[in-house]
Amino acid sequence: MRMRWLLCAALMALGMSVIAEPRLPRTNARDLQQRIARHKGKVVIVNFWATWCGPCMEELPDLARFYRNYKARGVEMIGVSFDDEETADQTVPPVLRRNRVEYPVLVVKQNFDQFADRFDKEWRGEVPRFYLYDKSGKRVKAWSGKTSYATLEAEVRRLQQSRR
């Protein structure tokens, strides 16, 4: 009897250790634009990134810290991963936990080039890529390349001051 109880306990513990990560939400260009529009009244930063992108991984701690400090000040952030949709649920969540990312992260559910073209005709699909939206939902700036906490802070402050 004792052996049976130990076997059951071991199987339960083993089962709990292999519970799958929750599935990350998928998005296409239209869905993302609708999500951005739902945040009217806030400044919105959209960050396109991937776990295979060195500069993306380097800037992630700054992005996470920026969001923690600015979410109460009317800033929303949305991360969009270009990781392969088939493996994103295994590769992305550990990176988000390790970097204490609290903002929503979505995974592109279509061809990256098509996504980039539908989201912004001028974007070639490079990452990291950022888009800044004012409180009315208007896109006011787009840029590519590794971005620091100080750069995000300056962009948001400039936008908030110019819209007063």
Residues of each region from the PLM?
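Hydrophobic h-region of N-terminal signal peptides that target proteins for export
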Residues: 10-19
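A short beta-strand-turn-helix
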Residues: 23-44, 67-70
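Short pre-active-site segment immediately N-terminal to redox-active cysteine/selenocysteine motifs
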Residues: 42-44, 48-52, 126
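Structural microenvironment flanking redox-active thiols in thiol-disulfide oxidoreductases
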Residues: 58-99, 111-117
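Thiol/disulfide oxidoreductase modules built on the thioredoxin-like
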Residues: 99-101, 108-155
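Non-globular targeting/processing and membrane-anchoring segments
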Residues: 161-164
